[in-house]
Amino acid sequence: RVGASVQSPFVPTLRLDATQPLGETIAALNKFQPEALVAYASVGRLLALAQLEGQLEIAPHSVFTSSEVLTEESRSLIAKAWGKPPMNVYAATETATIAAECEYRVGMHFFEDLVITEVVDDQYRPVPPGEYGEKIFVTVLFSRTQPLIRYEMSDSIRLTDEICPSGKPYALIDGIQGRHEEVLHLPTPSGETVAIHPNVFHDVLDLIPTGGWQVILEPTGLRLLLVGVRNRDDELKLLSALR
């Protein structure tokens, strides 16, 4: 069952639907007062904003983010809200945790005693450290119910040869771009195409105080929807950054 790995009869756990209204989530968290907060990266950012604005009043000892790319802006915002940077985790429903940051946060350590992870290009050839792959293969070593051998995931990640100050021997991920199929391929005036990764929009739009945003790919180009842009200066700043 999805999320079963975080359920325990010995540890009080509150599971919330990320799609429910934010106000309901805030009210539930204020009542529950979690000691550890685990959230999608985008939801963690929204909760951090709510904490800074005084709507959310919790004091977790640890904050974990997962399932989405954690931008530096979101990391800083979460650290500001709760006095500690989040611990980023790389996981999938099918495989459980694949890698996670340690206290030094210089990258994410593979759980090499639990999963074997291979970074490959679009021709399934191994990709060396320092380069982003097109996808990964994951072999799960602990699942006896549903064996997964070289399970293909379209995540684009980059390894590094650097050694973590912690001294842990596990290989490090130093970059995650997310799912390869989320990359937009747009025409250029010269008739060629250019690849635009969703992180480009995060890097720009996360800096603007909005209630949310959505980018829609249409036959004639991109349409950007914004919620709650507070003033004209923010609009001009956003247009300048996008250009």
Place the predicted regions along the sequence by residue.
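Active-site glycine/GP-rich loop and adjacent strand/helix microenvironment
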Residues: 2-243
